[in-house]
Amino acid sequence: MKIPVLAPALFALATLPAFAAPDLVNRLSWGVTANGAGAERAWLEQQLHPGDDDGLPPQAVDQIAALDISRKPMTEIAIAVKQLQLQARAAKGTDGAKDARKPYQQALNDLERQAQTRSLLRDLYSRNQLKEQLTWFWFNHFNVFAKKGEIRAMVGDYEETAIRPHALGKFRDLLAATVFHPAMIQYLDNQQNAAGKINENYAREIMELHTMGVGSGYSQADVQELARILTGVGVNLTGIPRRVGPQIREQYVSDGLFEFNPRRHDYGDKTFLGHAIKGSGLQEVSDAIDILSRQPATARFVSTQLAQYFCCDAPSPALVAAMTATWQHSDGDIAAVLRTLFDSNEFGASLGHKFKDPMHYAVSAVRLVYGDQVIANTQPILNWLNRMGEPLFGHETPDGYPLTEAAWAGPGQIATRFEIARQIGAGAPQLFRADGDTVTRPPPPVLEQTAWYQALQLPTATRDAVTQGATPADRNMLLLSSPQFMRR
């Protein structure tokens, strides 16, 4: 399908070619649904400025509301899990050690599964699709590995309170929310960072991956100074505030699991990226966040990442420069930066050409085939993501999953997608079976009869291949395996 270069007035969707609106929706959402391929004139504006109501169907709302992570605060959950760990440790070396560890591991696994379920249900059914795509993008940008320590007890809250609310807001607020979240602090070992025993791990990743990027002009001395600024920022899983002396008691901060312990902080003055920062405690961290979020290098690096995710693997210097300028003029307003991206000819020309990573492939396939039915079991999707090498919340290193086609277009990946396409196209009844449930579902829709298929400009070779399928399930599989469906 040849995509024309779009006029700059991209927001006037009525002026686009008939097929461009579905392509736009396909790029900025987790995929079109079978009978919802079109886009209204105001759709993009609504996506850039969504309201609080995600418009989830009642069945999805009920599933999310029933989760422990939706009913209990993270602090209560994480402290309870920590107690299970302490009980398991107390039994170490005894005959009951193995059994004593099971409740701890089961609790962590269940909490991770709950977080994954809530995230996928929103991806599948929220009307605010751009926000949900950005929630995945920003989680990947500020990545934490769920299976490290007690992070499985925190990862749902990390996505829900640190990432999602700021996905289309100011970058400074997003950065701050991640800096002060216990999941990030524990993941990058900042609870081990103390005056006289500096741990540079988190400071280095903030500068290298979260803000300025490698080779952007900061020095090793800047990393060391930021590490000093971050001393004392930690996590308290006991539920009991620390005892500190009266002379520093006012400096101590305890907020849920977050803790700033002045006894561990380096109160010496610092020079960070050319800025003098007076030793003052937690305020130093806020000052550093202000400095980092307003660096031209941060604007350029993060704009490049956004362009790679939403446009193309190698965005032009001109596009990145335009986005960077908007960033600096708007003080890091993410929606404004995205507006500049979406209004560009380069973005319009890229529609339909961006290769889907595993998350986009799996979620878009389920949305297309079952977009009008609320699934009862997300485990099959999680299994598919694992098989394709992109488990949800499962990237071990802080760099996050790659965003480029080369990482995901290998022959092994494509073969796995064919197998998954066969399962989804044949009905995937396991999606609609909760634990212990034997209910069956009607067969999937015949995709070739949907509005989506009718609007799709498939090459003749692809249409001919699809018609070779002997059954609707076979034809669904062939569509979901087609080169066109592999792209967005």
Language model regions located:
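Flexible, low-complexity segments enriched for small/polar residues
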Residues: 22-37, 45-48, 65-68, 295, ...
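N-terminal accessory alpha/beta regions
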Residues: 34-141, 145-156, 162-164
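Active-site substrate-binding loop specific to GH73 endo-beta-N-acetylglucosaminidase modules
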Residues: 115, 151-372
